Amino acid sequence: DSEYVNNVGIIQQNPKVVAINNAIEIDVTGQVCADSIGNKIYSGVGGQMDFIRGASLSEGGKPIIALNSTTKNGISKIVPFLKKGAGVVTTRAHVHYVVTEYGIANLYGKTIEERIKLLIGIAHPAHRDQLNQSSKLVLA
């Protein structure tokens, strides 16, 4: 029953919960889109926020967003801004760890500037220069 399985109060009672969730894209501040591509719904929200919150409240828990750094067509999934119309499933305030094939970014408690640097550091190397340039607009 999803009312029990996805219950944050139940999840947090278990120590060392590791919640691994996927993302369609993530912006350089840590906002996660996991249900849409722009304004086109791709999937349901599911229990992503339940498990992110439950793991973060679990003693020794680790909430993780894991994604490939690029789409199959080589487009970066780490972006300066989410696509117009994209839904924010997990807010930047709830994101702790983001993992790509290029490393791990621990965003918990970090400033926007620190988050930008950390997320660009785990982006595909071919996109890092462009992300550095585009991310200046985030801070403008």
Residue positions per predicted region:
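Conserved phosphate- and dinucleotide-binding cores of soluble alpha/beta proteins
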Residues: 1-140
